[in-house]
Amino acid sequence: MSESSIDTLKTMLANLDDAKKYQSLRDVMETLPAPDLAAVFEDLPAEKLPVLFRLCPKDLAADVFAELTPATQQQLIDGLTDTELKAVVDELFVDDATDLVEEMPANVVKRILAQAEPATRRMINELLKYPEDSAGGVMTTELMALRPDMTVAQAMDTIRENGFDKETINNCYVTDSSRRLVGVVSLRALVLAKNTEEPIKDLMDSNVVSVSTTTDQEDVSKLFEKYGFLAIPVVDAENRLVGIVTIDDAISILQDEASEDIAKMNAIGPSDKPYFKQSMWDLYKSRAPWLLFLMISATFSSLVIRGYEDALAAVTVLTAYIPMLTDAGGNAGSQSTSTIIRGMAVGDIQPHDLPRILWRESRVALLCGGTLAVCNFAKMLLFDRIAAPVALVVCLTLICTILLSQIIGGILPVAAEKLHVDPAVMASPLITTIVDTTTLLVYFNIAKALLHL
């Protein structure tokens, strides 16, 4: 039903200037969840954004706004009056409002803060003190806190009275008089409690998994993956409860980290903008420096070839198999690197596992290299009609190349981790250049030894 409603909405937007369509448009919008409405907004030209946003049901407007990309949010803010902007900011959860302030240019930030309530402004400024990629930077302060001496009935009354403005009430956090975190109790436990006079301290779980305000956001997201939480409490250095990180933020973190790693692994500067929201200049800046670096690095391969020109001149057929050998080596190295980086990202592999990594990769490389060499040897003899000694040179090089490539692919991510460099930045872009040069050196030296060049 959602897909058909989206299609209907897009069709109606084509005739947005027809005033009779506005009520029908609002009716369709009321049937759509916030993420689907936000997807429609992303496809609209800037001048139509405020018009459609004003038709949003009041209880949905802030949720739709929070789902938009920063670029679209800025376009929409530019088209809203101060009164309309104030209504949006007041309805945003404080972590979403903080994200908005972090993403906007200074002139827009001044306007946002000017429209925010003093209490909201204080909370935003408090969250902005933490590093952007830390638990403190992504947490929200809108949580449900209870006291251990409360009864179940008192706790339920507190939740009914204050829960509407909280980001989640699935878990309620129990704090002492100094706001130190002492336990957690689920809404389920409160609802199902048979004795409404039972104190919270008898129901709560005192073994609470929490994170510090300075914990890296990627480490926080791993805890969600490990424990299946919907929220994780955040405490300061004195174990005082200062906020929570919710599952929606954890999912966003995982998506951002994955996008960043994929970009880095392919030698592209990461960007938080969608592809079609990036200008040609943005795309150029994210790619050109890496391409230039890799082009310069590739000159090592040219130097190797120039150093063995006599061998190539004597047996020119060797030249024909250089692309196949370097491609096979690069592919094998990339497979190894990607596997190790992924293992390190999910915690399966640690730097001290390097000896085990090399032992496993070596055995896999010999199996893969042997299989490729046998197939290639038969192809060269039967189809290419190449002399057996030359075929032997190529196939021995193929085995050595696969072996060296997978060993290098296993070492680079671990070395990057030891040097406190992102493995995706160091390992993936460099693997092809290193393997190409290594492959050529092995190839020409085997050729010189076996063909007596």
Predicted regions and their residues:
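Interfacial loop-to-transmembrane junctions
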Residues: A415-V435
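Soluble-to-membrane junctions at the N-terminal ends of transmembrane alpha-helices
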Residues: K273-F293, P351-G370, A391-V394
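Juxtamembrane "helix exit" motif at the C-terminal ends of alpha-helical transmembrane segments
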Residues: M295-L312, C375-I386
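Alpha-helical transmembrane segments in multi-pass membrane proteins
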Residues: A34, W290-A298, Y321, L325, ...
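Non-transmembrane, extramembrane segments of multi-pass ion/lipid transporters
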Residues: R122, D249-L283, S334-I357, V414-H420
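Membrane-water interface of transmembrane alpha-helices in multipass transporters/channels
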Residues: G307-Y321, D384-L396
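Hydrophobic, small-residue-rich transmembrane alpha-helices and their short perimembrane loops
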Residues: V304, V317-Q335
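Hydrophobic packing positions in regular secondary-structure scaffolds
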Residues: M1-G269
